[in-house]
Regions:
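Hydrophobic alpha-helical transmembrane segments and adjacent interfacial helices
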Residues: 24-28, 55-70, 93-100, 118-130, ...
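Membrane-proximal helix-loop-helix units in multi-pass membrane proteins
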Residues: 80-148
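N-terminal topogenic module of multi-pass integral membrane proteins
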Residues: 1-71, 204-205
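Membrane-helix interface and helix-disruption motif detector
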Residues: 4-11, 41, 67-85, 105-109, ...
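Terminal transmembrane helical module of multi-pass membrane proteins
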Residues: 131-208
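Membrane-interface helix-boundary motifs at transmembrane edges
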Residues: 34-45, 102-109, 160-174
Length: 208
């Protein structure tokens, strides 16, 4: 029977960075309306969503589950089980988000998708605020919960009206979603920066 040594190198920073890149691509476009959405922009954003936000998180989620089960090198931190669930689920759902954006598909089903992801986000913030030193990741999950609340409003275009000239009023939910994407994306960049410095250079910054 082989014994695997515990590892302090859980690869969460790759997931933080990948999702942060996705948010900082999607967020400004949603908030500012630039570049204006068309087929080319949607295909470009779709590719980034699939590979950066999707694949990076999915890879980390699978890696964590393997490191918690088959090769138990991360079992000293039980909160990583929640991280594995979140990275796997968020990664897979970004495959769908990115592909739908690439294809120009209807975004309304995203509104229903947001409901279970609010649940996962609340689960994450509950676990990490309780975990020792886990509040920075708790803040992240709080931001993610807000993202999915605004995703619901944006996807169903709540409050959008058709004006007398045929134009539509501003989708406030989309603007709020974009602003939240930017803020959470910046927090993800901070978590990437702080956690990498803590592990690689012995810093003691608040991080994962």
């Amino acid at each position: 029977m082989s014994t695997f040594p515990a590892s302090a190198f859980a690869p969460v920073v790759l997931g933080f960075f990948g999702l942060g890149v996705g948010y900082l691509i999607y967020g400004p476009q949603e908030f500012l309306g630039f570049p204006r959405r068309d087929g080319k922009v949607d295909r470009a954003n779709g590719i980034w969503g699939i590979w950066m936000a999707g694949f990076c998180q999915f890879l980390v989620g699978v890696y964590l589950f393997v490191g918690l089960t088959w090769f138990p090198v991360f079992t000293g931190n039980k909160a990583l089980y929640t991280a594995a669930l979140a990275f796997s689920a968020y990664g897979i759902h970004w495959f769908a988000l990115g592909w739908n954006r690439y294809q120009g598909n209807d975004s309304r089903p995203n509104g229903f998708m947001s409901i279970p992801f609010i649940v996962v986000s609340v689960l994450g913030l509950t676990v990490f605020y309780k975990a020792d030193g886990g509040w920075p990741v708790g803040v992240l999950f709080t931001g993610l919960a807000v993202v999915y609340v605004f995703e619901f409003a944006a996807s169903f275009r709540l409050g959008v009206r058709t004006l007398a000239d045929g134009r539509e009023s501003i989708n406030v939910g989309e603007k709020l979603l974009g602003a939240t994407h930017v803020l959470v994306g910046l927090w993800l960049m901070y978590l990437t920066f702080a956690t990498t410095l803590n592990i690689s250079s012995g810093y003691h910054l608040p991080g994962a």
